[in-house]
Structure formats: C-alpha cells, structure tokens
Amino acid sequence: MNIAIVGAGLMGRLVALSLLRGDQLRDKKLRQSQSQSVTITLFDKDNKLAHNSAAYAAAGLLTPLGESLHCEPNIVSMGFESLRLWPTLLDSLDEHTIFQQTGAIMVSHEQDKGDYQRFIKHLKNNYPEHALHTLSRAELLKLEPEIGRSFNQGLYLPQEGQIGNRRLLVALRKQLEKENKHTSSGNKLNWLSECQVIGIEGEIKNEINTTDETRTISYLHGGDKQCQRFDLVIDCRGTGATSKNSQRDCAPLSDLRSVRGELFQLFAPDVHISRPVRLMHPRYQLYIAPKQKGFYVVGATEIESDDDSPMTVRSAMELLSAAYSVHPGFAEANIRQHVSQCRPAFSDNQPKITHKGSLIQVNGLFRHGFLIAPVVLRQVLALVNNRINNTNDNLPYSDYLRTEQRQEEMI
Amino acid sequence: MMALNIYGHQLDSRLLIGSALYPSPEVMKQAILASGSQVVTLSLKRQNPAEQSGQQIWRYIQEVVTEVNGHLLPNTAGCKTAKEAVTLAKMSREIFKTNWLKLEVIGDDYNLQPDPIELLNAAEQLIKDGFKVLPYCTDDLVLCQRLYDLGCQVIMPWASPIGTGKGLMNPYNLETIRLRLPDATLILDAGIGKPSDACLAMEMGYDGILLNSAVALADNPILMAKAFSHALEAGEQAYVAGVMQQRQTAHPSTPTLDTPFWHQNS
C-alpha cells in the first residue's frame, strides 16, 4: 500500500512515524497478520530541519487552562488528554525531549488586577474540576523566587506543562531515519524534503464506492516535475493548504487562513524561572517558557496577517518590555533569535480533519499544535485504519475534534 | 428606529461595530449579525498594508459587511501623526474602495487619548482629498466644533479611553456637545462597557454608538451584541418619546386626595 503524507511539520512527522511502526492497525494480531506492507512517502517543501514550520516557531506550552480564555472548552479537553498521552509517545523515542509537568504561573501587574480576577472567575466557573491555587506574594516567592519580587499575587495551575518543541522535531526526524533502516514491520519511508507538491488529484474508479479511489501527487523535486500515485494521501501542510498558497488542483482549504505570530529566543543566564509564566495584560498576551540552560522563549504576538517577514519593532518592543516587567533580569539577556511564522487557522479557530475517499486533510491547529497533537494523531490513525480495512469504526475523539466528510472538492 | 445618516447614507442600525479582539473570526461574524450593525470598522496598521498581508481577514470582514448590506469603515488606529494617518488612509481607500474613514490619531500611549492638533491637521488634509471623515476625538466642545467647521459631518467623541469599559465619564461634556452641534451626526465612540452606557448616550440624543471591546470581550459576544442592539433601540425610542423632567417633589401617579400638601411637615 502506498501512502503519501504532505507536510513534515509536527503532525506530518508524528503521522509518518506511527504509520512506519504500523500503529494505525490498533489490533496487534491484525498487525501481525497484515501481510501487506506500507510504503510511506513524506513530502515537504522545507528541509529536514523544519525551520519554516509553525512547530519550530512555537514555545511548546502544554497549558490548557492558560489558553482557556482564548479558546473553546473542547481545546482545553484535548489539551488535558494530550498531557496524558505525550509521555508514552516521548518514551518511544531514543532522543531525549524535555517534557515538564510542574505547573504554570499566571501573574498580572497591580493596575491590571481586573483581568486577573476575571480569569480566576472564568476558571472557577468553567473548569471547576481542575486544580488552581491563588498565591499570596509569600507563596509566589516560595514557588518562583525571582517572579515573586515583581508581583503581589499569582495563580498556580499545577497540571500545566511544556515540551521541548524544537528538540522533538529533531528527535522525530532521527527516529524516522533510524526506524526506517531497522524496520520490523516491513514498512518503508521515503522522505522527499525540499520538494514542492503542485497537485493532489483524485481518480475515482467507482462513484458510489470510493474505496478504489487513488490520488496522484505531482511535485517538483530537484528541478524535475514528477508524478506518483497513492492509495491514500494525508495532507498535513498547515498554512501551505490555504487558497493563497495552494493551487486549485492541489486541494486547497478555502476557509483556512494564516495568522502571524512572533517570538524571541533569549539567553538569560541570570534569570531563574523554572516553569512557564504568563503575564495577563489588557493589550498583550505574553508568555515566558524556560527552555533549560538559561534559554527562554518569549512570545507571542497574534496578528491577522499572512506576512512572514521578520519581526516588527513594535512587536519586539511589546514582547521585550512585557518580559522585562516580569523579570528585570531580561534586560541583560542576549537576543539569540527572533522568529516570525504563520499559524494555520480556520475561521472558528478550531482544528479540523476532513476526509473524502483517499484524501485526509488535517489542519487548523492554530496556536495549539503541541497542546493537542497526540489527540489529533490518534484520530487520524483511526481514520486511516477505517480506510485501510474498509470499516466505519467509531473515532476516539469525535466529541472534541471536528472530523467530517469534505463537502466540496476543489479539484 | 429612525435611520442613521452617515454622509447621506441612511442606515437602519445606529450601532457601529469593531472587528478586533473576538475569540475567532466566526464569533466576530455571528456577533456582527446579532448586533444588526451595518457599519464595521477595521484596522490595517499592523497587517503590513503595503503588502496587503491581511487580505484573508479583510475579505472575511468584507463578506460579512456584504451579507448585512452594510459599509466598511477602515480606521487609522495606531497612527500618531497626521502624516502617518493620511498615508494609511490613502492606502485603505485603495484597498477597500471606500472614502469613508474613521480618523484616529493617538497622542498618548497610556490612555490612547486622541491628539487634537494632529487630528485637526489630518482631517483638513483628508477632507480636501475627498475623504468622508469620521474623526474619533475627545469630548471637548471646541475641538468637536472645529472638526465640524472643517467639514466633518460626523463627529465621534469618546465616552472614556479605548477598551476601558468605563462608560460615560463626563456626561456634562457629552450633553453640551449634543446641544451645541444639533445638526452634526454624533456617534459616541470608545469606552462603552455596558449596554446601559449605550442606552444613556442614546437617551441624550446621540445618533449612534461605535464599540468593539464591550462585545468582543464579553463572555458571550453574540448574546452581548444582541443586548447592545436592544439597548440602542431603547435609548433611541426614549429620546424620541421625550424623557420626563426630574422634580424635587414626589408626584403620585395615583392621586391621593386624602393627603393635602399642607399636611407635609417641612
């Protein structure tokens, strides 16, 4: 069986590794009896470092409650479920990736106390089942000594965490390369990086029964145009699938848009913060994610724009002054990197899986990629399983994750 | 409700609504539809307008505006000088094919207070250039008068600083502007927090309300949009109906013949 994955960002890599391992076949006996091996072709316009992916330009926060004021409750539920799923997934990788679940802290300056109190009320009203601790200045000083100096109170959300987003992308690449060499399942991976997909066209042999349908992917690789036919195509392109970035015969998602985000990577050895911190501010959404050995990620803007040019001075001033107000030690930090990237979002800012015949499209993870990826992965694998076995089994996360038949074919 | 007149265009709704800060574009769309508003403001300052990088969201907003048979009102939010505002205004006219403009020139970073001098300067240049200017200004009578004299048929004084939700900070000033500029279309812009704030301004005789945060940041923006729509209607009807005069002495609505006035102690 030939399966194509288009896009080797976070989702593309996770799906590729699972298919290479044969994880889509949930039943172990079935997996063993499955004589037909799978050949996976992973297409990506980027090189294998994935520096142009939304996942690279992220902070890897796993903070469902911290996000809850700006997202729907189903994202929060998927976030908590993913926090449960990540450790098993990471344990299966040889390369070490930071996974921390020691809670997160929310703070606000005295003049913005109204927003802080509103947030506490929001959590208590909408998420009473999850723990939260309001901290006095003394308690905050004890938990995060260097934050306590600047704030009179804070909120501690003990279940929140973070992941090493960039390390994970590297770990997944290495794992894919290793397992491809020593695969026991007979499955094979062919990773075509720096390859531009220019067409994803369906060929339906039978209008009523689409199980026979195949897809032909046209692509430019090394200057040559080539075509290849697949039994199944899993599209994980992110912003590459917007109407602007994707041609008519390349299965664009018409409701998908790009939302610009900017962040800094700072080296601040004099700052000692051990867990993610969010600053509640009426104008900015700021988080500081400690990434070990003195590195911090400070983000992130959210601008309705598909511009991925370098960070603007205004955004830089907003992010850095907000970070400085949380900890004056950032004044002496080195700016190691400033990153701008676009995140893919549908008009309701919800993720969506659409499928029709031999095409599955996973998109719209917006600013919640790492927060919900394991849940999205399981849902995709269940769909693949249904497709391969021609079954219609219930999908595990249909209550949370919109999964629907693609209504109109653009091709 | 009677029609709202914006530069000769008669609109059914007296609510003008912003398109920022909503949880998602879809919620924004539903809130605008629920509000009944036919004028939607949008800013383009941060979207690299020279490259038209905000095309996707602009198109989305334009589709909503078309659906309600309304008008787009581009603004110059984020501009600090007349020069900057004029440049952005020209770009927005080119992109959105409208000469309507909410003119905003900020003079203070902390409370985002408009700069009256730069505002007048920009308004003068833009009117000469054919723009229909809707200036966002402070509640200063003389400034409003000057803007009106320049040719701004619509004047938009603030209720309180943008995004504070503090409501009508200086009702005396706002009433004075209404009394002294009876022919201007007066829209109360910024600082509205609750539907009752909007209702109060409409009872004063304001022609309309422009708001954004009060709806977008509500726990349920769509429901709040409806609440504002009702509040504006109530305030407008109250103004037309004529509010009774306040009195010092109680006046029973049911005559109490057995209590003659000379029985009072004081």
Go through the PLM ranges and name each one.
Chain A
Residues 4-6, 43, 228-240, 377:
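Short hydrophobic core segments
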Residues 14, 18, 61-62, 66, ...:
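Active-site substrate-recognition segment that forms the wall
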Residues 20-55:
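Glycine-rich FAD pyrophosphate-binding loop
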Residues 59-143:
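Dinucleotide-binding Rossmann-like beta1-alpha1 core, especially the glycine-rich loop
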Residues 70, 74-80, 107-115, 155-174, ...:
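Short beta-strand to alpha-helix junction loop
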Residues 96-109, 121-122, 131-175, 301-305, ...:
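Helix-loop-beta segment of a Rossmann-like dinucleotide-binding subdomain
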Residues 154-203, 207, 219, 236:
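Helical element adjacent to the flavin cofactor pocket in flavoenzyme catalytic cores
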Residues 333-411:
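C-terminal catalytic lobe of FAD-dependent flavoproteins
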